[in-house]
C-alpha cells in the first residue's frame, strides 16, 4: 500500500500487520484494540467495501462513548480510499449513506495526501473514532510537503478557503 510503505519495517510486525480481508472482522479487531488502550488505524482497502463494516461502525464503534456515559472510548481511525468514480467497484462514493449512518464518527475527506497527514496527526491524539477517506487521485499528485509533516495538523470543522470569491462549495 502506498500510504503505509515501510511502516512494518520501522515499527515491527507486532504494531503493523496484515489481517484477513473481512471488513466486519477488521472493524471488530480495531474496536477491541482501541478499548484496550491502543490506537489502531484499521484499513479498508476501498471506500466501496466500507459498506460491509457499516453496521458495526454505526451500532458499535460510534456509540461506545455514548453508551458508557463517557467511561469507555474507542479511538479507532478507519483509513480507506476512493472517489475516483471510474467504475462499478473500487471507485464508488456512498458518502451520503456513510455520513448519515455514522453519527458519532468524524468523517474526513482530504483533498490531497498532505491534508490527509494533517488529519492523521490530529486524530491520533483524539479520543473519538474517525474515518479518513483518502482521494485515489492523491496518490498521483506531486506535492510540496511542509517541513513539519510529522507535527502538521488540520483542525476539524474549520473550512479551507482555496480561492476567495462570491460562490461557495459545501461538502
Protein language model regions, located:
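Glycine-centered loop/turn motifs
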Residues: 148-159
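Thiamine diphosphate
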Residues: 1-139, 143, 149-151
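Glycine- and Gly-Pro-enriched alpha-helical subdomains that act as flexible
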Residues: 159, 164-165
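Glycine-rich phosphate/diphosphate-binding loop of Rossmann-like nucleotide-binding domains
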Residues: 168-171
